[in-house]
């Protein structure tokens, strides 16, 4: 297992085998959600497992799930899942997007992408397949191979089911696809229920308009039919479906800003207010919720956006895409967005959706997935350190000790991307003998400052000399014993 992953070593196999027995007795009950059990004072096996992974008391996990500040996306039909948590009390998580497009990929290719994403540390994976393949086949293959929660956007398949015809798409089509995804084991679904018909005029004046694919589909539907968003009017029906499978809402932000100019505008904030209403409606059904957020946001507006979401949505976990803090770096948007992601995580965002270097340019390949995930694992980890989460800095300290001791193999092992670290070291010093060397190619064998090995004992001796010579014109010479 690569060190980028958040799975606890030694715990990644047993839960996948055991979870079928955990959920067997729950099947057929009217409500099998983790929130439902938590509100009854029950610590489920999933909650207990999450507590171990997060180094948190089981009682705290149960309380946070009951309160809605933490979710455990874990559909009862996804039995090979290793349960994980998303919430402000847990470590900041990272999602990776995969999915077949009309122009590329198939089920086997998507499973390869899934395995790559998990290898490089994805805590959840979203299947954003839009067509050109058998979507049910792709989704079933992904869920069957995934130890991490899988999310989907059902409106894509709803539109595909009527061959892309907005005029033929009706309310029941949406609900049929939503339940199908639940039956297949999808752990969370992006439901764009917060976009109301009265919000659409607020988009006037934007540079990039509506940039959410799901939101765009629903906007077209409302404009064509002159009716309210069916995902809003049928929201309670969706809650009834979700609680039978313990599928979690990821409330979609259809009006997220697609550029710096559009950030924090009236359209975005109007939808956010509705998302808060929907969060509380879902909680009345004991259904778990996280809320999606922007997008493209200037650095100085990120804290406002996080705090506003917490206020409007009663502290339901926040899940953001980036945000990108500038729009002028196509090809480097994994960097422009990781900057914003680290800040968003520091201010309390619970999960970060990765962005790859191909964002705005094309479909990412394997190298792009790797680059995007590592950038976001860095951002999430930086946020964990800044929020002083239990044990967050332990690996940093361990790697720093290995660095000071010139233990190159230990440094590689502890890296987020060991392969890259070793590759860069070996470009100039490839021989095995250099894995014991007390230098790298930057300073060479004579100029590394860490070779001096000034010890605490040396410094304590210096302190005594300084104290003894307080006020003296000259200091007594101090001899420092260097390590062998």
UniProtKB/Swiss-Prot annotation:
Binds 1 [4Fe-4S] cluster per subunit. The cluster is coordinated with 3 cysteines and an exchangeable S-adenosyl-L-methionine. It catalyses: 5-amino-1-(5-phospho-beta-D-ribosyl)imidazole + S-adenosyl-L-methionine = 4-amino-2-methyl-5-(phosphooxymethyl)pyrimidine + CO + 5'-deoxyadenosine + formate + L-methionine + 3 H(+). One of its GO terms (cellular component) is cytosol. Zn(2+) binds at residues 296, 360. GO terms for biological process: thiamine biosynthetic process; thiamine diphosphate biosynthetic process. It comes from the Bacteria. Gene3D superfamilies: 6.10.250.620, Radical SAM ThiC family, central domain. Pfam families: ThiC_Rad_SAM. Its EC number is 4.1.99.17. [4Fe-4S] cluster binds at residues 440, 443, 448. Substrate binds at residues 97, 126, 156, 192, 212-214, 253-256, 292, 319. Pathway: Cofactor biosynthesis; thiamine diphosphate biosynthesis. The keyword Lyase applies. It is an enzyme of class 4 (lyase). GO terms for molecular function: 4 iron, 4 sulfur cluster binding; carbon-carbon lyase activity; zinc ion binding. The keyword Flavoprotein does not apply. Keywords: 4Fe-4S, Iron, Iron-sulfur, Lyase, Metal-binding, S-adenosyl-L-methionine, Thiamine biosynthesis, Zinc. NCBIfam families: PRK09284.1, PRK13352.1, thiC. PANTHER family: PHOSPHOMETHYLPYRIMIDINE SYNTHASE, CHLOROPLASTIC (PTHR30557:SF1), THIAMINE BIOSYNTHESIS PROTEIN THIC (PTHR30557). Catalyzes the synthesis of the hydroxymethylpyrimidine phosphate (HMP-P) moiety of thiamine from aminoimidazole ribotide (AIR) in a radical S-adenosyl-L-methionine (SAM)-dependent reaction. Belongs to the ThiC family. This is Phosphomethylpyrimidine synthase. It comes from Synechococcus sp. (strain CC9605). The gene is thiC.
């Amino acid at each position: 297992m690569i060190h980028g992953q958040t799975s606890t070593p030694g715990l990644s196999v047993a839960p996948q085998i055991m979870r079928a027995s955990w959920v067997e007795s729950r099947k057929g009950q009217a409500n099998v959600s983790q929130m439902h059990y938590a509100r009854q004072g029950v610590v489920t096996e999933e909650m207990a497992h999450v507590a171990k992974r997060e180094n948190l008391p089981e009682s705290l996990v149960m309380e946070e799930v009951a309160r809605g500040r933490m979710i455990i996306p874990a559909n009862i039909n996804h039995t090979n899942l290793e349960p994980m948590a998303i919430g402000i009390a847990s470590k900041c998580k990272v999602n990776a997007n995969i999915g077949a497009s009309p122009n590329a990929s198939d089920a086997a290719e998507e499973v390869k992408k899934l395995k790559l994403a998990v290898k490089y540390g994805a805590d959840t994976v979203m299947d954003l397949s839009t067509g050109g393949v058998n979507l049910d086949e792709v989704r079933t293959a992904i869920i069957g191979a995934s130890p991490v929660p899988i999310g989907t956007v059902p409106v894509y398949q709803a539109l595909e089911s009527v061959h892309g015809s907005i005029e033929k798409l009706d309310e029941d089509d949406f609900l049929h696809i939503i339940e199908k995804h639940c039956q297949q084991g999808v752990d969370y679904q992006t439901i764009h229920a917060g976009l109301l018909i009265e919000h659409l005029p607020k988009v006037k004046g934007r540079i990039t308009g509506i940039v959410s694919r799901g939101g765009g589909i629903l906007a077209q539907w409302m404009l064509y039919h002159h009716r309210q968003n069916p995902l809003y009017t049928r929201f309670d029906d969706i809650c009834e479906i979700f609680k039978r499978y313990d599928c979690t809402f990821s409330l979609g932000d259809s009006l997220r800003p697609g550029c710096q100019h559009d950030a924090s505008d009236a359209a975005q904030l109007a939808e956010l207010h509705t998302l808060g209403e929907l969060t509380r409606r879902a909680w009345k059904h004991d259904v778990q919720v996280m809320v999606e957020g922007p997008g493209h946001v200037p650095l100085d507006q990120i804290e406002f956006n996080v705090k506003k979401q917490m206020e409007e949505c009663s502290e339901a976990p926040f899940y953001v895409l980036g945000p990108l803090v500038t729009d002028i770096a196509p090809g480097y948007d994994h960097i422009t967005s990781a900057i914003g992601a680290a800040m968003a995580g520091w201010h309390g965002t619970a999960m970060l959706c990765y962005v790859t270097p191909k964002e705005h340019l094309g479909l990412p390949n394997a190298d792009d997935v790797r680059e995007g995930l590592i950038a976001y694992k860095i951002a999430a980890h930086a946020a964990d350190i800044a929020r002083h989460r239990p044990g967050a800095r332990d690996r940093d300290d361990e790697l720093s000790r290995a660095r000071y001791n010139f233990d190159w193999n230990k440094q590689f092992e502890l890296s987020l991307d060991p392969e890259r670290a070793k590759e860069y070291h070996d470009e100039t010093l490839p021989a095995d003998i250099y894995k014991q060397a007390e230098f790298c190619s930057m300073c060479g064998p004579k100029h590394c400052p860490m070779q001096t090995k000034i010890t605490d004992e040396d410094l304590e001796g210096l302190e005594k000399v300084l104290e003894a010579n307080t006020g003296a014109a000259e200091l007594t010479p101090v001899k420092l014993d260097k390590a062998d």
